[in-house]
Curated annotation (Swiss-Prot):
Residues 146-166 have a biased composition (Basic and acidic residues). Keywords: Cytoplasm, RNA-binding. The lineage of its organism: Bacteria, Bacillati, Cyanobacteriota, Cyanophyceae, Synechococcales. This is SsrA-binding protein. It comes from the Bacteria. It comes from Synechococcus sp. (strain RCC307). The gene is smpB. Residues 142-166 are annotated as: Disordered. It is found in: Cytoplasm. Belongs to the SmpB family. InterPro entries: SmpB (IPR023620), SsrA-bd_prot (IPR000037), SsrA-bd_prot_CS (IPR020081). The keyword Transferase does not apply. One of its GO terms (biological process) is trans-translation. GO terms for cellular component: cytosol. Required for rescue of stalled ribosomes mediated by trans-translation. Binds to transfer-messenger RNA (tmRNA), required for stable association of tmRNA with ribosomes. tmRNA and SmpB together mimic tRNA shape, replacing the anticodon stem-loop with SmpB. tmRNA is encoded by the ssrA gene; the 2 termini fold to resemble tRNA(Ala) and it encodes a 'tag peptide', a short internal open reading frame. During trans-translation Ala-aminoacylated tmRNA acts like a tRNA, entering the A-site of stalled ribosomes, displacing the stalled mRNA.
Amino acid sequence: MAGKGKGAKAAAKKRLEAQKLLADNRQARHQYEILDTLETGIELLGTEVKAIRAGKANLRDGFCLIRQGQLQLHNVHIAGHEQASRYFNHEPLRVRRLLAHRREIDKLRGQLDTKGLTLIPLNIHLKGSWIKLTIGLGKGRKLHDKRQEERRKQDQKDLRSALKRL
């Protein structure tokens, strides 16, 4: 019986490691109102995988487009792998293909026809041994929307702290 307890803990630890967050675009949720999300695969080179696992990815200026029926990730900087030479390293800002089902891409294309919507990379994470990218369908926020959202969050924080004091 004692062996089963250790196995369960090890399995839980393994599951947590399998869902590890590798890069996050925190500013995206501030600048955009996220209406829908989609988890996609990402086509990477070997040195890109090693660099992402080392935490060398920057999603801040990234965006996604649908070109020729394929999802593409643009303007995401993945730094070169330190152990690789310049000859074997990848180009940091290259266009990367995203892997999604045709029906998901068609659904996104239909939603993107609405004016003002865009696809933004939200985070890169591990799912098992696969690197996945979560993209969000977002609508840009105006300055007053950002202020209103900050005010709402501050009010909720104040309310929670007031309830704790009671």
